[in-house]
Regions:
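FAD-binding subdomain of flavoenzyme oxidoreductases
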Residues: 75-79, 86-171
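Extended, hydrophobic alpha-helical segments in both membrane/secreted and soluble proteins
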Residues: 47-49, 56, 97
Length: 171
């Protein structure tokens, strides 16, 4: 999207900063993200992954191509309730994740105050914490693995999660 209305919606977050992005991409698939990475690499345009926009420090605004994965890449891919593990897409909102985990007697313990809007991708990018962090830890203590696309378009795996065949698909 190149229109000023759409770009304006992504020019701010919960911080005091305002910066108009060059464009906004709302990917439907991971191939869309890879194509966006290639375009940015070929044109020298910066990219900015954006999730809930709940940061009060301005990490989600910049003069860049903003990629918003919250609209379509927001599901639980796999759930292993017995081992208390799941594979999720980066755009899933924390409250929605916990709503889907609750019938299995599970919940994700990192409890940010913006849980109705904060996404797992954004929480991972910021290593989020919350009021229960002293007991249950912060994001790095509760995430086993992340798969991420690098600027050259390659997929890198961080951590180890052999029992799940799917990547965590977190930028």
């Amino acid at each position: 999207y190149y229109d000023n209305f759409t770009k304006g919606r992504y020019a701010t977050d919960a911080s005091i900063y305002q910066m108009m992005p060059h464009a906004v991409v709302i990917p439907k698939t991971y191939d869309d993200i890879v194509a966006c990475l290639a375009f940015a690499r070929d044109t020298g345009t910066p990219l900015l992954p954006r999730w809930g926009g709940t940061s009060q420090c301005g990490q989600t605004v910049n003069h860049a191509i903003v990629i918003d994965s919250t609209k379509h890449l927001n599901k639980i891919i796999e759930l292993d309730a017995e081992n208390r593990q799941c594979v999720v897409e980066p755009g899933i909102v924390l409250d929605e994740l916990n709503r889907q985990l609750q019938p299995h007697g599970l919940w994700f313990p990192v409890d940010v105050s913006t849980s109705s809007r904060a996404t797992i991708g954004g929480m991972a990018a910021n290593n989020s914490c919350g009021g229960r962090s002293i007991r249950y830890g912060i994001m790095r203590d509760n995430v086993l693995a992340i798969d991420a696309w690098l600027a050259d378009g390659s997929l890198a795996s961080f951590g180890k999660l052999e029992q799940f065949p799917h990547p965590m698909n977190t930028l």
